[in-house]
């Protein structure tokens, strides 16, 4: 089986859940009529076994079997920590 595992990067927007967090993935889509590029956001719930991610972190996630009703992604690594103010 040579299926490639899907991985994406996004920014953590919520970490209030236990062993879970929510990320936002931004992409740019061209408007069909105006031709202008518009930002679109996708929110995903991610499984985080060790509660590593914090709000503002940039993380890499991969697709996995469904962990719950809304979670079918798991944390691979924290790419960049958020800047603490």
Swiss-Prot record:
InterPro entries according to UniProt: NA-bd_OB-fold, Ribosomal_uS17, Ribosomal_uS17_bact/chlr, Ribosomal_uS17_CS
PROSITE patterns associated with the record: RIBOSOMAL_S17
Highest rank taxon of the organism: Bacteria
GO molecular function: rRNA binding; structural constituent of ribosome
Keyword Ribosomal protein in annotation: yes
Keyword Ribosomal protein among record annotations: yes
GO biological process, one term: translation
Listed Pfam families: Ribosomal_S17
Cellular component GO terms held in the UniProt record: cytosolic small ribosomal subunit
Transmembrane segment boundaries: none
Alphabetical UniProt keywords: Ribonucleoprotein, Ribosomal protein, RNA-binding, rRNA-binding
Subunit record text: Part of the 30S ribosomal subunit.
Family: Belongs to the universal ribosomal protein uS17 family.
Free-text function comment from the UniProt entry: One of the primary rRNA binding proteins, it binds specifically to the 5'-end of 16S ribosomal RNA.
This protein's name: Small ribosomal subunit protein uS17
Protein's organism: Mannheimia succiniciproducens (strain KCTC 0769BP / MBEL55E)
